[in-house]
UniProtKB/Swiss-Prot annotation:
Keywords: Cytoplasm, Hydrolase, RNA-binding, tRNA-binding. This is D-aminoacyl-tRNA deacylase. A Gly-cisPro motif from one monomer fits into the active site of the other monomer to allow specific chiral rejection of L-amino acids. It catalyses: glycyl-tRNA(Ala) + H2O = tRNA(Ala) + glycine + H(+); a D-aminoacyl-tRNA + H2O = a tRNA + a D-alpha-amino acid + H(+). The keyword Lyase does not apply. The gene is dtd. GO terms for cellular component: cytoplasm. The lineage of its organism: Bacteria, Pseudomonadati, Pseudomonadota, Betaproteobacteria, Burkholderiales. It is found in: Cytoplasm. NCBIfam families: D-aminoacyl-tRNA deacylase. It comes from Burkholderia cenocepacia (strain ATCC BAA-245 / DSM 16553 / LMG 16656 / NCTC 13227 / J2315 / CF5610). Belongs to the DTD family.
Length: 152
């Protein structure tokens, strides 16, 4: 599984003109399931995402996870947005191939599992809609962006 994460001061996602998810300071994660991914891979990616230290401590060092963005125990928001294009094969030609992405039904199942697991472990979780045409707005803080990938 793949997550492209961005530290944000705010972010939201809209589908058909309505807001489906919105957070203040926290992480926007674009999430993709690849062929062969499992719930174990989703669990591993979620653990990495929730523990990844990208927020600054009192000394200005990236040392705090999304569960403690201010060093005083305040959890940041987590906005999870499905994005199968992260698995694109761009090695040949001028058109990406999405063969490496999980089939839509499997991708939806794993994304739903990932969201449910995140909600069980983190207090502020918002989402987009799997498979929908979404408009994502964000203010990238830093900018700070990381590519996280785990194999099944």
């Amino acid at each position: 599984m793949i997550a492209l994460i961005q530290r944000v001061t705010r972010a939201d996602v809209r589908v058909g003109g309505r807001t489906t998810g919105e957070i203040g300071a926290g992480l926007l994660a674009l999430v993709c399931a690849e062929r062969g991914d499992t719930e174990a891979a989703a669990d591993k990616l979620l653990a990495k995402l929730l523990g990844y230290r990208v927020f600054s401590d009192a000394a200005g060092k990236m040392n705090l996870p999304v569960s403690n963005i201010d060093g005083e125990g305040r959890a940041g928001g987590l906005l999870l947005v499905s994005q199968f294009t992260l698995a694109a094969d761009t090695n040949s030609g001028l058109r990406p191939s999405f063969t490496p992405a999980a089939p839509p039904d499997e991708g939806a199942r794993l994304f739903d599992y990932f969201v449910a697991a995140a909600r069980a472990r983190h207090p502020v979780v918002e989402t987009g809609e799997f498979g929908a045409d979404m408009q994502v707005s964000l203010v990238n803080d830093g900018p700070v962006t990381f590519w996280l990938q785990v194999r099944p």
